[in-house]
UniProtKB/Swiss-Prot annotation:
The protein, known as: N-acetylglucosamine-6-phosphate deacetylase
Consequence of gene disruption: Synthesizes high levels of glucosamine-6-phosphate deaminase and over half of the amount of glucosamine-6-phosphate synthase compared to wild-type.
UniProt entry tagged with the keyword Metal-binding: yes
Binding site for substrate: T142, H143, N219, A220, R227, D248, G249, L250, H251, L306, S307, G308
Catalytic residues identified in the record: D273
Alphabetized PANTHER family for the sequence: N-ACETYLGLUCOSAMINE-6-PHOSPHATE DEACETYLASE
């Protein structure tokens, strides 16, 4: 048992000064005034840093020089372990490894690997995000068109049978029958709209069928026009739909993030959609069967198509504060509490309270990570 002291604590709801977080057996035992700590307890100083729940990234293709995509060798427990270690350096304690449009065979391998990883590493990766393959070719982005397809009963059944390790599926609502969306949602999978050319009417039909999330708002969806709001307009119009947004200033203009925040409130989640260069020093990598080039913060293919980001969660937090003018407490909720709610893990993650998993991060006022704790263990100390 130990207590984190001498920092500013953000519980997920409020900032507390002169308080401590007591950690024991991998869980938060209490959040209490420093004056109430037992005299014999070990105290670990935060040296004035801000202590927050660990960040939760619900869309992450790769980082730390690796990708959970493309090949049987890459879709492995080892890749997920490398991604977790890279994440921890940027304050991210939990994430959804994202496997983009690929073959049935590699999807099934991803499920097997996820099951093995979850048995070995609790409260870190939180299940698989399958981004595709039921997308609209018009909005495929960097996804391999040879693998984009319509749903078939066998694959739908397989996903539902493995819903305990598949947390989220991204699909184009106009390409997937309502009964398939409902079946996935009823199995306990978060169904997300993305890589879609849906009209407002098609998007709303998808929402009624069971879609509760939207993948990287504004990206890989039609422009909003006066007569046709499209998927983006539907997301902004529907109060209960969660969505992720990439806050690197390259995927989405900061003015659009501000507008989305005004409309979506507590349903807007920070995501990175990161790829191998995040937390690594590389200039190119393979993604969706293509060479992707990393230059000046951009990840693009040979045609200039955006192909994921190099963003880390702490960089996204800083960008939302410094470039969007969103208050720090609300930005931290966008990186912790709101994604936890979106994927249904808020009872154990996303806030600092007694009984919650002790996944936390600490950072300086200039957004440098000083400490990351996973299951009560300090995994990063700087």
């Amino acid at each position: 048992m130990y207590a984190l002291t001498q920092g500013r604590i953000f519980t997920g709801h409020e900032f507390l000064d002169d308080h401590a977080v007591v950690i024991a057996d991998g869980l938060i035992k209490s959040v209490c005034p420093v004056a109430e700590l037992p005299p014999e307890i070990e105290q670990r100083s935060l040296n004035g840093a801000i202590l927050s729940p660990g960040f939760i990234d619900v869309q992450l293709n790769g980082c730390g020089g690796v990708q959970f995509n493309d090949t049987a060798e890459a879709v492995s427990v080892e890749t997920l372990e490398i991604m977790q270690k890279a994440n921890e350096k940027s304050g991210c304690t939990n994430y959804l490894p994202t496997l983009i449009t690929t073959s049935d065979e590699l999807m099934k391998q991803g499920v097997r690997v996820m099951r093995e990883y979850l048995a070995k590493h609790p409260n870190q990766a939180l299940g698989l995000h399958l981004e595709g393959p039921w997308l609209n070719l018009v909005k495929k982005g960097t996804h391999n068109p040879n693998f984009v397809r319509k749903p078939d009963a066998a694959l739908v059944d397989f996903l539902c049978e493995n819903a305990d390790v598949i947390t989220k599926v991204t699909l184009a609502p106009e390409m997937v029958p309502a009964e398939v969306i409902s079946k996935l949602a009823n199995a306990g999978i978060v169904v997300s709209a993305g890589h879609s050319n849906a009209t407002l009417k098609e998007a709303k039909a998808g929402f009624r069928a069971g879609i509760t999330f939207a993948t990287h708002l504004y990206n890989a969806m039609p422009y909003i026009t006066g007569r046709e709001p499209g998927l983006a307009g539907a997301i902004l119009d529907e109060a209960d739909i969660y969505c992720g947004i990439i806050a690197d200033g390259l995927h989405v203009d900061y003015a659009n993030i501000r507008n989305a925040k005004r409309l979506k409130g507590d349903k807007l989640c920070l995501v990175t959609d990161a790829t191998a260069p995040a937390g690594a020093n590389i200039e190119q990598f393979i993604f969706a069967g293509k060479t992707i080039y990393y230059r000046n913060g951009l990840c693009v293919d040979e045609n200039g198509t955006l192909s994921g980001s190099s963003l880390t969660m702490i960089e996204g937090v800083r960008n939302l504060v410094e470039h969007c003018g969103i208050a720090l407490d609300e930005v931290l909720r966008m990186a912790t509490l709101y994604p936890a709610r979106a994927i249904g893990v808020e009872k154990r993650l996303g806030t600092l309270a007694a009984g919650k998993v002790a996944n936390l991060t600490a950072f300086t006022p200039d957004f440098k990570i000083t400490k990351t704790i996973v299951n009560g263990n300090e995994v990063v100390t700087q």
